[in-house]
Amino acid sequence: MMRIALTLAFLFAIAAGAPASAQQTLSIGTFFGAWSGGGVAENEDSIYFRSTVRDFDVTIRPAGAGFRIDWTTVIRKGGNPDKPDIRRRKSTKTLMPTGTPGVFHGTDSGDPLSGKEMYWARLDRNTLSLFLMMVDKDGIYTLQQYDRTLSGTGMRLSFKSLSDGDRQREVTGRLIKSGK
């Protein structure tokens, strides 16, 4: 009976310890590589095209002590529903570590009240979050959040855009690693 109790206690201790190790924050290097995929955007600011299809290309690579992230979004929106207009948006951000583990500051991040974009990133467990904040001349802010979460099958993207507290757009998608 004592042997069974000890065995059960041992198994319980292993099971209880597993989630803690599974929830450790990954290193930024785990995200390095080229990623490709697609998703769907839900837009509050569009009358005719509330949902649009998007393609994504993301490259995350080392840059000094930090990292650089380049991404391209292909947006199919507007025009004739059978032949929508296609636009490409490209962005590049370079981030360096702060004194806080898992927190990075943008190398050319500015003062949003002076018309400059402010951005930073946070690494928490298996999610790399990038935040961008802008303030217009009337003091109305826009906050964008890109969550890139690694899973066994690749990367999950969740994007949210708020303007003065109101949801403007949400994008969800999946990406797979397409290169180093």
Regions found by a protein language model. Give the residues of each.
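Short, solvent-exposed loop/hinge segments that bridge or flank secondary-structure elements
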Residues: 25-26, 32-72, 83-89, 141, ...
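Bacterial N-terminal signal peptides
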Residues: 7-16
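Acidic, glycine-rich flexible loop segments
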Residues: 111-152
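Positively charged n-region of N-terminal signal peptides that target proteins for export
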Residues: 1-5
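Predominantly extracellular/secreted and cell-surface proteins with exposed
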Residues: 73-128
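Sec/Tat signal peptide C-region and signal peptidase I cleavage site
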Residues: 18-22
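Short beta-strand segments that buttress and anchor functional surface loops
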Residues: 70-73, 106-107, 129-136, 145, ...
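Hydrophobic/aromatic beta-strand elements that line small-molecule binding cavities or substrate pockets
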Residues: 54-61, 93, 116-121, 143-150, ...
